[in-house]
From Swiss-Prot:
<dbReference type="InterPro" id="IPR013783">
    <property type="entry name" value="Ig-like_fold"/>
</dbReference>
<protein>
    <recommendedName>
        <fullName>Interleukin-18-binding protein</fullName>
    </recommendedName>
</protein>
<keyword id="KW-0945">Host-virus interaction</keyword>
<comment type="function">
    <text>Soluble IL18-binding protein that may modulate the host antiviral response.</text>
</comment>
<dbReference type="GO" id="GO:0005576">
    <property type="term" value="C:extracellular region"/>
</dbReference>
<keyword id="KW-0244">Early protein</keyword>
<keyword id="KW-0732">Signal</keyword>
<comment type="similarity">
    <text>Belongs to the orthopoxvirus OPG022 family.</text>
</comment>
<keyword id="KW-0899">Viral immunoevasion</keyword>
<keyword id="KW-0964">Secreted</keyword>
<dbReference type="InterPro" id="IPR008791">
    <property type="entry name" value="Orthopox_IL18-bd"/>
</dbReference>
<feature type="signal peptide">
    <location>
        <begin position="1"/>
        <end position="16"/>
    </location>
</feature>
<dbReference type="Pfam" id="PF05566">
    <property type="entry name" value="Pox_vIL-18BP"/>
</dbReference>
Length: 126
């Protein structure tokens, strides 16, 4: 009987946690300014397991999508900044594009990975 109770108790605890829905956090947002892309997204549960990064894909070639640090000069990303307010953690990461000619035909993707899944948002220079 104890085992049955323990199984029922654990199912109730885990089931409600697994099926929780993030409702207070909006989707990813990208704000542009001169040569910069500001990406932000938020996490309600266990933000220490969340990660944000930028990817780039040259739309004029058959190359795979690359991490920003593999593109060489003319582009860089800042460290992810985390702020917490009211139990919600917001992650922000800025992408700086200084060589707009080199990256004119690139698609940039901001990626936020949380325990709830992966969110992506794309943006182009032109």
């Amino acid at each position: 009987m104890r085992i049955l109770f323990l199984i029922a108790f654990m199912y109730g605890c885990v089931h409600s946690y697994v099926n929780a829905v993030e409702t207070k956090c909006p989707n990813l947002a990208i704000v542009t300014s001169s040569g910069e892309f500001h990406c932000s997204g938020c996490v309600e549960r266990m933000p220490g397991f969340s990660y944000m990064y930028w990817l780039a894909n040259d739309m004029k070639s058959d190359e795979d999508t690359k991490f920003i640090e593999h593109l060489g000069g003319g582009i860089k990303e800042d460290e992810t900044v985390r702020t917490t307010d009211g139990g919600i953690t917001t992650l922000r990461k800025v992408l700086h594009v200084t060589d707009t000619n080199k990256f004119a035909h690139y698609r940039f993707t901001c990626v936020l990975i949380t325990l709830d899944g992966v969110s992506k948002k794309n943006i182009w220079l032109k």
